[in-house]
Protein backbone atom coordinates (compact mmCIF):
# COMPACT_ATOMS: atom_id res chain seq x y z
CA UNK A 1 0.00 0.00 0.00
CA UNK A 2 1.04 3.60 -0.52
CA UNK A 3 1.13 5.70 2.63
CA UNK A 4 1.68 9.32 3.60
CA UNK A 5 2.50 10.53 7.14
CA UNK A 6 1.55 13.98 8.43
CA UNK A 7 3.39 14.96 11.64
CA UNK A 8 1.99 17.58 14.01
CA UNK A 9 3.63 18.92 17.16
CA UNK A 10 7.09 18.50 18.61
CA UNK A 11 10.33 16.83 17.49
CA UNK A 12 9.51 13.81 19.67
CA UNK A 13 6.51 13.20 17.43
CA UNK A 14 8.75 13.48 14.38
CA UNK A 15 10.89 10.64 15.73
CA UNK A 16 7.82 8.42 16.18
CA UNK A 17 6.70 9.24 12.64
CA UNK A 18 10.08 8.16 11.33
CA UNK A 19 9.68 4.96 13.31
CA UNK A 20 6.31 4.24 11.68
CA UNK A 21 7.80 5.12 8.31
CA UNK A 22 10.58 2.59 8.82
CA UNK A 23 8.26 -0.16 10.02
CA UNK A 24 5.93 0.29 7.07
CA UNK A 25 8.73 0.35 4.52
CA UNK A 26 10.22 -2.92 5.81
CA UNK A 27 6.86 -4.58 5.07
CA UNK A 28 6.97 -3.42 1.47
CA UNK A 29 4.63 -0.45 1.80
CA UNK A 30 5.60 2.63 -0.23
CA UNK A 31 5.89 6.18 1.09
CA UNK A 32 4.48 8.89 -1.17
CA UNK A 33 4.94 12.65 -1.07
CA UNK A 34 1.30 13.73 -0.85
CA UNK A 35 -1.90 12.63 0.81
CA UNK A 36 -3.65 12.56 -2.56
CA UNK A 37 -1.40 9.73 -3.79
CA UNK A 38 -1.74 7.59 -0.66
CA UNK A 39 -3.92 4.57 0.06
CA UNK A 40 -3.43 5.22 3.78
CA UNK A 41 -2.92 8.65 5.39
CA UNK A 42 -1.45 8.64 8.90
CA UNK A 43 -1.71 11.78 11.03
CA UNK A 44 0.60 11.78 14.06
CA UNK A 45 -1.45 14.05 16.29
CA UNK A 46 -0.54 16.59 18.98
CA UNK A 47 -2.35 17.20 22.28
CA UNK A 48 0.03 19.66 23.97
CA UNK A 49 -2.47 22.47 24.57
CA UNK A 50 -5.95 23.40 23.33
CA UNK A 51 -4.59 25.17 20.25
CA UNK A 52 -2.66 22.04 19.24
CA UNK A 53 -5.76 19.88 19.61
CA UNK A 54 -7.78 22.34 17.53
CA UNK A 55 -5.12 22.16 14.82
CA UNK A 56 -5.17 18.35 14.97
CA UNK A 57 -8.94 18.20 14.54
CA UNK A 58 -8.75 20.74 11.72
CA UNK A 59 -6.16 18.68 9.85
CA UNK A 60 -8.14 15.46 10.35
CA UNK A 61 -11.36 17.06 9.11
CA UNK A 62 -9.61 18.59 6.10
CA UNK A 63 -8.00 15.29 5.10
CA UNK A 64 -11.21 13.35 5.77
CA UNK A 65 -13.13 15.77 3.58
CA UNK A 66 -10.73 15.16 0.68
CA UNK A 67 -10.68 11.35 0.94
CA UNK A 68 -11.38 9.46 -2.22
CA UNK A 69 -13.31 6.15 -2.19
CA UNK A 70 -11.17 3.40 -0.66
CA UNK A 71 -8.66 5.76 0.93
CA UNK A 72 -8.06 5.26 4.67
CA UNK A 73 -7.24 7.78 7.42
CA UNK A 74 -5.45 6.83 10.65
CA UNK A 75 -5.13 9.18 13.64
CA UNK A 76 -2.08 8.22 15.69
CA UNK A 77 -0.14 9.60 18.63
CA UNK A 78 -0.87 11.98 21.46
CA UNK A 79 -4.41 13.21 20.82
CA UNK A 80 -5.51 9.72 19.74
CA UNK A 81 -4.37 8.64 23.21
CA UNK A 82 -5.57 11.62 25.26
CA UNK A 83 -8.91 12.30 23.53
CA UNK A 84 -9.74 9.04 21.71
CA UNK A 85 -13.50 9.61 21.47
CA UNK A 86 -13.08 13.11 20.10
CA UNK A 87 -10.60 11.91 17.47
CA UNK A 88 -12.61 8.83 16.53
CA UNK A 89 -15.68 11.06 16.27
CA UNK A 90 -14.26 12.90 13.26
CA UNK A 91 -16.24 11.55 10.34
CA UNK A 92 -13.79 9.93 7.94
CA UNK A 93 -11.25 8.71 10.51
CA UNK A 94 -10.96 4.95 9.96
CA UNK A 95 -8.63 3.98 12.81
CA UNK A 96 -6.76 5.27 15.86
CA UNK A 97 -3.40 4.35 17.35
CA UNK A 98 -2.14 5.60 20.74
CA UNK A 99 1.24 6.87 21.86
CA UNK A 100 2.55 3.48 22.96
CA UNK A 101 1.04 1.50 20.08
CA UNK A 102 2.76 3.08 17.08
CA UNK A 103 5.05 0.05 16.72
CA UNK A 104 1.90 -1.87 15.76
CA UNK A 105 1.26 0.31 12.72
CA UNK A 106 1.72 -2.64 10.36
CA UNK A 107 -0.91 -4.68 12.20
CA UNK A 108 -3.36 -1.80 11.94
CA UNK A 109 -2.63 -1.17 8.26
CA UNK A 110 -3.12 -4.90 7.73
CA UNK A 111 -6.62 -4.60 9.20
CA UNK A 112 -7.35 -1.75 6.82
CA UNK A 113 -6.19 -3.70 3.76
CA UNK A 114 -9.41 -5.72 3.87
CA UNK A 115 -12.07 -4.80 1.28
CA UNK A 116 -13.40 -1.34 2.00
CA UNK A 117 -16.83 -1.11 3.60
CA UNK A 118 -17.82 2.56 3.98
CA UNK A 119 -18.27 3.52 7.62
CA UNK A 120 -21.70 4.75 8.56
CA UNK A 121 -22.03 7.70 10.96
CA UNK A 122 -21.47 6.53 14.52
CA UNK A 123 -19.86 3.21 13.51
CA UNK A 124 -16.76 2.42 15.64
CA UNK A 125 -13.41 2.93 13.98
CA UNK A 126 -10.70 0.27 13.97
CA UNK A 127 -8.19 0.54 16.77
CA UNK A 128 -5.33 -1.12 18.58
CA UNK A 129 -6.28 -1.17 22.30
CA UNK A 130 -4.76 1.80 24.08
CA UNK A 131 -2.14 1.23 26.75
CA UNK A 132 -3.40 2.41 30.14
CA UNK A 133 -1.17 5.15 31.50
CA UNK A 134 -3.30 6.34 34.39
CA UNK A 135 -1.82 3.84 36.86
CA UNK A 136 1.56 5.54 36.62
CA UNK A 137 3.40 2.26 36.10
CA UNK A 138 6.18 2.61 33.53
CA UNK A 139 6.31 0.06 30.73
CA UNK A 140 9.36 -0.85 28.70
CA UNK A 141 10.37 1.53 25.96
CA UNK A 142 9.02 0.63 22.53
CA UNK A 143 11.62 -1.80 21.19
CA UNK A 144 12.30 -0.56 17.70
CA UNK A 145 15.66 -1.15 16.06
CA UNK A 146 17.62 1.29 13.96
CA UNK A 147 17.47 -1.12 11.02
CA UNK A 148 13.70 -0.65 10.97
CA UNK A 149 13.93 3.10 10.66
CA UNK A 150 14.48 4.79 7.37
CA UNK A 151 15.90 8.23 8.08
CA UNK A 152 15.39 10.47 5.06
CA UNK A 153 16.36 14.02 5.93
CA UNK A 154 16.09 17.24 4.01
CA UNK A 155 18.67 18.66 6.41
CA UNK A 156 21.79 17.10 7.94
CA UNK A 157 20.20 17.16 11.39
CA UNK A 158 18.23 14.38 13.11
CA UNK A 159 16.35 14.05 16.37
CA UNK A 160 17.09 11.06 18.60
CA UNK A 161 14.54 10.35 21.32
CA UNK A 162 16.23 8.77 24.33
CA UNK A 163 13.16 8.37 26.54
CA UNK A 164 9.41 8.83 26.47
CA UNK A 165 6.96 9.83 29.16
CA UNK A 166 7.66 11.89 32.27
CA UNK A 167 7.81 11.30 36.02
CA UNK A 168 7.11 14.94 36.84
CA UNK A 169 3.58 16.09 37.56
CA UNK A 170 3.65 19.81 36.80
CA UNK A 171 0.28 21.34 37.61
CA UNK A 172 -0.27 22.80 34.13
CA UNK A 173 0.80 19.80 32.04
CA UNK A 174 -1.30 16.98 30.58
CA UNK A 175 1.56 14.99 29.01
CA UNK A 176 1.96 12.30 31.72
CA UNK A 177 -1.75 11.52 31.46
CA UNK A 178 -1.30 10.20 27.92
CA UNK A 179 2.43 9.49 27.74
CA UNK A 180 2.76 7.75 31.11
CA UNK A 181 5.83 7.61 33.32
CA UNK A 182 9.32 7.90 31.86
CA UNK A 183 10.69 4.93 29.94
CA UNK A 184 14.35 5.22 28.94
CA UNK A 185 15.73 3.65 25.80
CA UNK A 186 18.66 1.36 26.72
CA UNK A 187 22.10 2.87 26.22
CA UNK A 188 23.04 0.27 23.61
CA UNK A 189 19.96 1.03 21.53
CA UNK A 190 20.71 4.77 21.62
CA UNK A 191 24.32 4.17 20.55
CA UNK A 192 23.24 1.90 17.69
CA UNK A 193 20.75 4.46 16.43
CA UNK A 194 23.29 7.26 16.63
CA UNK A 195 25.79 5.23 14.62
CA UNK A 196 23.12 4.47 12.03
CA UNK A 197 22.31 8.18 11.72
CA UNK A 198 25.96 9.16 11.29
CA UNK A 199 26.46 6.42 8.71
CA UNK A 200 23.52 7.90 6.81
CA UNK A 201 25.17 11.31 6.61
CA UNK A 202 23.68 13.06 9.64
CA UNK A 203 26.02 15.74 11.03
CA UNK A 204 23.94 16.83 14.03
CA UNK A 205 22.14 14.59 16.53
CA UNK A 206 19.59 16.38 18.71
CA UNK A 207 18.78 14.42 21.86
CA UNK A 208 15.15 14.87 22.92
CA UNK A 209 12.88 13.56 25.66
CA UNK A 210 10.11 14.90 27.85
CA UNK A 211 12.69 15.19 30.65
CA UNK A 212 16.20 14.72 29.28
CA UNK A 213 18.13 14.99 32.54
CA UNK A 214 16.04 12.20 34.11
CA UNK A 215 17.35 9.74 31.52
CA UNK A 216 18.33 6.32 32.85
CA UNK A 217 16.74 6.62 36.28
CA UNK A 218 14.42 3.72 35.46
CA UNK A 219 17.44 1.73 34.21
CA UNK A 220 19.22 2.11 37.54
CA UNK A 221 21.76 4.58 36.16
CA UNK A 222 23.17 7.38 38.29
CA UNK A 223 23.85 10.49 36.22
CA UNK A 224 22.44 8.56 33.27
CA UNK A 225 22.61 11.43 30.79
CA UNK A 226 26.29 12.07 31.53
CA UNK A 227 26.98 8.35 31.14
CA UNK A 228 25.13 8.23 27.84
CA UNK A 229 26.90 11.30 26.46
CA UNK A 230 30.34 9.92 27.28
CA UNK A 231 29.52 6.69 25.46
CA UNK A 232 27.96 8.52 22.51
CA UNK A 233 31.16 10.47 22.06
CA UNK A 234 33.09 7.21 21.82
CA UNK A 235 31.07 6.02 18.81
CA UNK A 236 30.58 9.28 16.86
CA UNK A 237 33.19 11.25 14.89
CA UNK A 238 34.64 14.34 16.63
CA UNK A 239 33.04 16.66 14.04
CA UNK A 240 29.52 15.42 14.85
CA UNK A 241 27.31 17.81 16.81
CA UNK A 242 25.35 16.40 19.76
CA UNK A 243 22.75 18.84 21.08
CA UNK A 244 20.71 18.63 24.30
CA UNK A 245 17.06 19.68 24.42
CA UNK A 246 14.55 19.74 27.31
CA UNK A 247 17.11 19.46 30.14
CA UNK A 248 15.34 20.31 33.39
CA UNK A 249 17.58 22.30 35.76
CA UNK A 250 17.24 20.14 38.87
CA UNK A 251 18.81 17.24 36.94
CA UNK A 252 21.89 19.17 35.83
CA UNK A 253 24.76 17.75 37.85
CA UNK A 254 28.41 18.71 38.16
CA UNK A 255 29.29 15.54 36.26
CA UNK A 256 26.96 16.46 33.41
CA UNK A 257 28.50 19.93 33.12
CA UNK A 258 32.01 18.43 33.13
CA UNK A 259 31.01 15.90 30.47
CA UNK A 260 29.53 18.61 28.24
CA UNK A 261 32.75 20.61 28.49
CA UNK A 262 35.02 17.62 27.86
CA UNK A 263 33.99 16.28 24.44
CA UNK A 264 34.21 18.14 21.12
CA UNK A 265 31.00 16.55 19.84
CA UNK A 266 28.76 18.05 22.53
CA UNK A 267 27.45 21.46 21.52
CA UNK A 268 27.96 24.19 24.09
CA UNK A 269 24.21 24.69 24.08
CA UNK A 270 21.52 23.78 26.56
CA UNK A 271 17.75 24.04 26.33
CA UNK A 272 16.59 24.30 29.95
CA UNK A 273 12.83 24.83 30.43
CA UNK A 274 12.33 26.97 33.56
CA UNK A 275 8.67 28.08 33.14
CA UNK A 276 8.92 30.85 35.75
CA UNK A 277 11.27 32.52 38.22
CA UNK A 278 9.14 33.51 41.21
CA UNK A 279 9.11 30.90 44.00
CA UNK A 280 5.38 31.29 44.70
CA UNK A 281 4.48 30.81 41.04
CA UNK A 282 6.79 27.79 40.78
CA UNK A 283 5.16 26.22 43.85
CA UNK A 284 1.73 26.62 42.26
CA UNK A 285 3.22 24.98 39.16
CA UNK A 286 4.49 22.09 41.35
CA UNK A 287 8.04 22.78 40.23
CA UNK A 288 11.21 23.33 42.31
CA UNK A 289 11.04 26.92 43.59
CA UNK A 290 14.76 27.56 44.15
CA UNK A 291 15.57 30.31 41.64
CA UNK A 292 18.92 31.01 43.31
CA UNK A 293 19.96 27.43 42.59
CA UNK A 294 18.98 27.88 38.96
CA UNK A 295 21.18 30.98 38.72
CA UNK A 296 24.06 29.02 40.26
CA UNK A 297 23.64 26.31 37.63
CA UNK A 298 23.71 28.93 34.87
CA UNK A 299 26.89 30.39 36.38
CA UNK A 300 28.49 26.94 36.59
CA UNK A 301 27.61 26.19 32.96
CA UNK A 302 29.19 29.47 31.83
CA UNK A 303 32.27 28.94 33.97
CA UNK A 304 32.85 25.54 32.35
CA UNK A 305 31.86 26.68 28.84
CA UNK A 306 32.16 30.47 28.45
CA UNK A 307 30.66 30.37 24.95
CA UNK A 308 27.62 28.28 25.90
CA UNK A 309 24.22 29.35 24.55
CA UNK A 310 21.43 28.78 27.06
CA UNK A 311 17.82 28.64 25.96
CA UNK A 312 14.71 28.50 28.13
CA UNK A 313 10.93 28.71 27.96
CA UNK A 314 8.53 30.46 30.32
CA UNK A 315 4.78 30.65 30.90
CA UNK A 316 3.17 34.07 31.36
CA UNK A 317 -0.23 34.55 32.94
CA UNK A 318 -0.17 31.42 35.07
CA UNK A 319 -3.09 31.38 37.56
CA UNK A 320 -2.39 33.67 40.48
CA UNK A 321 0.53 35.41 38.77
CA UNK A 322 0.56 38.85 40.36
CA UNK A 323 2.18 41.95 38.93
CA UNK A 324 5.00 41.50 41.45
CA UNK A 325 5.53 37.88 40.40
CA UNK A 326 5.65 38.84 36.73
CA UNK A 327 8.14 41.62 37.45
CA UNK A 328 10.28 39.07 39.33
CA UNK A 329 10.36 37.02 36.13
CA UNK A 330 11.53 40.06 34.16
CA UNK A 331 14.21 40.75 36.79
CA UNK A 332 15.36 37.15 36.50
CA UNK A 333 15.76 37.53 32.74
CA UNK A 334 17.82 40.68 33.29
CA UNK A 335 20.06 38.82 35.72
CA UNK A 336 20.35 35.51 33.84
CA UNK A 337 21.00 37.09 30.42
CA UNK A 338 19.81 33.98 28.57
CA UNK A 339 20.70 33.73 24.90
CA UNK A 340 17.36 32.38 23.67
CA UNK A 341 13.91 32.51 25.23
CA UNK A 342 10.50 31.33 24.17
CA UNK A 343 7.32 32.23 26.04
CA UNK A 344 3.93 30.55 26.16
CA UNK A 345 0.70 32.29 27.03
CA UNK A 346 -0.87 30.17 29.76
CA UNK A 347 -3.44 27.75 28.35
CA UNK A 348 -6.07 26.42 30.77
CA UNK A 349 -6.06 22.65 30.26
CA UNK A 350 -9.10 20.72 31.54
CA UNK A 351 -8.16 17.99 33.99
CA UNK A 352 -4.99 19.67 35.23
CA UNK A 353 -4.64 21.03 38.78
CA UNK A 354 -3.81 24.45 37.34
CA UNK A 355 -7.20 24.64 35.65
CA UNK A 356 -8.87 24.59 39.08
CA UNK A 357 -6.65 27.26 40.65
CA UNK A 358 -8.27 30.54 41.69
CA UNK A 359 -7.26 33.91 40.28
CA UNK A 360 -7.10 32.95 36.62
CA UNK A 361 -5.38 35.81 34.78
CA UNK A 362 -7.44 37.71 32.20
CA UNK A 363 -6.47 37.08 28.54
CA UNK A 364 -5.76 40.79 27.95
CA UNK A 365 -3.27 40.80 30.83
CA UNK A 366 -1.63 37.61 29.58
CA UNK A 367 -1.20 39.12 26.13
CA UNK A 368 0.28 42.34 27.51
CA UNK A 369 2.73 40.45 29.71
CA UNK A 370 3.79 38.18 26.86
CA UNK A 371 4.70 41.15 24.67
CA UNK A 372 6.54 42.87 27.53
CA UNK A 373 8.61 39.77 28.23
CA UNK A 374 9.46 39.21 24.57
CA UNK A 375 10.46 42.87 24.08
CA UNK A 376 12.84 42.62 27.02
CA UNK A 377 14.31 39.34 25.83
CA UNK A 378 14.79 40.70 22.32
CA UNK A 379 17.12 43.37 23.68
CA UNK A 380 19.01 40.75 25.70
CA UNK A 381 19.32 38.40 22.73
CA UNK A 382 20.53 41.28 20.55
CA UNK A 383 23.25 42.13 23.06
CA UNK A 384 24.29 38.47 23.36
CA UNK A 385 24.48 38.10 19.57
CA UNK A 386 26.53 41.28 19.16
CA UNK A 387 29.32 39.58 21.12
CA UNK A 388 29.93 37.36 18.11
CA UNK A 389 30.57 40.14 15.58
CA UNK A 390 34.19 39.88 14.46
CA UNK A 391 34.57 36.34 15.78
CA UNK A 392 34.77 33.09 13.84
CA UNK A 393 32.12 30.42 14.29
CA UNK A 394 31.57 27.04 12.66
CA UNK A 395 28.36 26.84 10.62
CA UNK A 396 26.45 23.76 9.47
CA UNK A 397 25.05 24.64 6.03
CA UNK A 398 21.44 23.53 5.50
CA UNK A 399 20.39 25.24 2.29
CA UNK A 400 21.01 27.89 -0.33
CA UNK A 401 19.23 30.94 -1.63
CA UNK A 402 19.80 34.42 -2.97
CA UNK A 403 19.91 37.85 -1.38
CA UNK A 404 17.68 40.70 -2.55
CA UNK A 405 20.39 41.81 -4.97
CA UNK A 406 20.69 38.32 -6.46
CA UNK A 407 23.92 37.40 -4.67
CA UNK A 408 24.36 33.76 -3.66
CA UNK A 409 23.59 33.10 -0.03
CA UNK A 410 23.96 29.96 2.08
CA UNK A 411 21.82 29.38 5.15
CA UNK A 412 22.88 27.39 8.17
CA UNK A 413 23.15 27.25 11.94
CA UNK A 414 25.92 27.47 14.49
CA UNK A 415 26.26 25.40 17.65
CA UNK A 416 24.22 28.18 19.32
CA UNK A 417 21.10 27.46 17.25
CA UNK A 418 18.78 24.47 17.57
CA UNK A 419 16.82 23.42 14.47
CA UNK A 420 13.49 25.16 13.84
CA UNK A 421 13.30 27.18 17.07
CA UNK A 422 16.44 29.34 17.14
CA UNK A 423 18.16 31.69 14.72
CA UNK A 424 20.16 31.10 11.56
CA UNK A 425 23.51 32.12 10.12
CA UNK A 426 23.50 33.66 6.62
CA UNK A 427 26.77 33.19 4.72
CA UNK A 428 27.65 34.95 1.47
CA UNK A 429 28.39 32.40 -1.25
CA UNK A 430 27.09 29.01 -2.30
CA UNK A 431 28.17 26.08 -0.12
CA UNK A 432 26.82 22.50 -0.18
CA UNK A 433 24.21 21.48 2.37
CA UNK A 434 25.67 19.23 5.03
CA UNK A 435 29.08 20.87 5.08
CA UNK A 436 30.55 22.65 8.09
CA UNK A 437 32.51 25.79 7.34
CA UNK A 438 34.23 28.47 9.44
CA UNK A 439 32.49 31.83 9.16
CA UNK A 440 33.62 35.25 10.33
CA UNK A 441 30.59 37.07 11.73
CA UNK A 442 30.13 40.55 10.26
CA UNK A 443 26.63 41.45 11.45
CA UNK A 444 24.16 40.37 14.12
CA UNK A 445 20.47 40.92 14.79
CA UNK A 446 18.54 39.75 17.83
CA UNK A 447 18.09 36.31 16.33
CA UNK A 448 20.43 35.81 13.35
CA UNK A 449 24.06 36.21 12.35
CA UNK A 450 25.56 37.19 8.99
CA UNK A 451 29.09 36.47 7.86
CA UNK A 452 31.78 35.62 5.34
CA UNK A 453 33.16 32.11 4.88
CA UNK A 454 36.85 31.73 5.61
CA UNK A 455 38.90 29.75 3.12
Swiss-Prot record:
It catalyses: L-aspartate(89)-[ribosomal protein uS12]-hydrogen + (sulfur carrier)-SH + AH2 + 2 S-adenosyl-L-methionine = 3-methylsulfanyl-L-aspartate(89)-[ribosomal protein uS12]-hydrogen + (sulfur carrier)-H + 5'-deoxyadenosine + L-methionine + A + S-adenosyl-L-homocysteine + 2 H(+). Residues 1-114 form the MTTase N-terminal domain. Keywords: 4Fe-4S, Cytoplasm, Iron, Iron-sulfur, Metal-binding, S-adenosyl-L-methionine, Transferase. Transmembrane segments: none annotated. Its EC number is 2.8.4.4. Binds 2 [4Fe-4S] clusters. One cluster is coordinated with 3 cysteines and an exchangeable S-adenosyl-L-methionine. It is an enzyme of class 2 (transferase). It is found in: Cytoplasm. Residues 152-383 form the Radical SAM core domain. GO terms for biological process: tRNA modification. SUPFAM superfamilies: Radical SAM enzymes. [4Fe-4S] cluster 2 binds at residues 166, 170, 173. The keyword Signal does not apply. InterPro entries: Elp3/MiaA/NifB-like_rSAM, Methylthiotransferase, Methylthiotransferase_CS, Methylthiotransferase_N, Methylthiotransferase_N_sf, MoaA_NifB_PqqE_Fe-S-bd_CS, NA-bd_OB-fold, Ribosomal_uS12_MeSTrfase_RimO. GO terms for molecular function: 4 iron, 4 sulfur cluster binding; aspartic acid methylthiotransferase activity; metal ion binding; protein methylthiotransferase activity. Its cofactor is [4Fe-4S] cluster. [4Fe-4S] cluster 1 binds at residues 10, 46, 78. GO terms for cellular component: cytosol. HAMAP family: MTTase_RimO. This is Ribosomal protein uS12 methylthiotransferase RimO. It comes from Chloroflexus aurantiacus (strain ATCC 29366 / DSM 635 / J-10-fl). The lineage of its organism: Bacteria, Bacillati, Chloroflexota, Chloroflexia, Chloroflexales.
